[in-house]
Amino acid sequence: MENQPKLNSSKEVIAFLAERFPHCFSAEGEARPLKIGIFQDLVDRVAGEMNLSKTQLRSALRLYTSSWRYLYGVKPGATRVDLDGNPCGELDEQHVEHARKQLEEAKARVQAQRAEQQAKKREAAAAAGEKEDAPRRERKPRPTTPRRKEGAERKPRAQKSVEKAPKTVKAPREEQHTPVSDISALTVGQALKVKAGQNAMDATVLEITKDGVRVQLNSGMSLIVRAEHLVF
């Protein structure tokens, strides 16, 4: 018996499941909500195929159900399906709301990462611009003085005028922030700031959770932030 090829990543496992169960899984486009307990159905149906283990199946399912396209598909009126595409009941409101929050948090994380990357790019561009704009000091040729003839009177040297050094302009003081050391001391509605690279965005505390603090930015977006990214 020939050895079956082994799937090495969760993406490869998802591609295999989409080919094996096309009425349930999809490799692209909006995904359909899965039946509750579908993991055990997968174990029963694909046990031994492609050398798949339970750990691989569980990791692939976690990646699949946390993807944006799957979360978009979890909406009011949508129907869960089993491995063969048979309907298994409509989604309840609690699952729809949970998926909506997951999608909002995922988008907020991506936006925060992009803002941090853009801030770093601006800093790098500003640093490069300062180096290019700095003028190089040209050396002036030293004036040649005629040699004094023998017997000629020695003229007193003219005193050099002392050049005043240009006043240095003090750089504006950076705004000092106090890090949040204990999130349990925060209160709902309290104003603070969220660090994103070198910038700090104003925010308001909405909720204190076990994973961090849910805050709302001035833009209206809400996200969960860990304590090390919060300052006063």
Curated annotation (Swiss-Prot):
Stretches the record annotates as Disordered: 105-182
Localization: Cytoplasm
GO BP, sorted A to Z: post-transcriptional regulation of gene expression
Domain of life: Bacteria
Function: RNA chaperone with significant RNA binding, RNA strand exchange and RNA duplexing activities. May regulate ProP activity through an RNA-based, post-transcriptional mechanism.
Biased composition (Basic and acidic residues): 117-136, 147-177
This protein's GO CC annotations: cytosol
PANTHER family on file: RNA CHAPERONE PROQ
Keywords from the named record: Chaperone, Cytoplasm, RNA-binding
Record-stated family: Belongs to the ProQ family.
Entry annotated with the keyword Chaperone: yes
Cross-referenced Pfam families: ProQ (PF04352), ProQ_C (PF17516)
Protein name: RNA chaperone ProQ
Keyword Magnesium: no
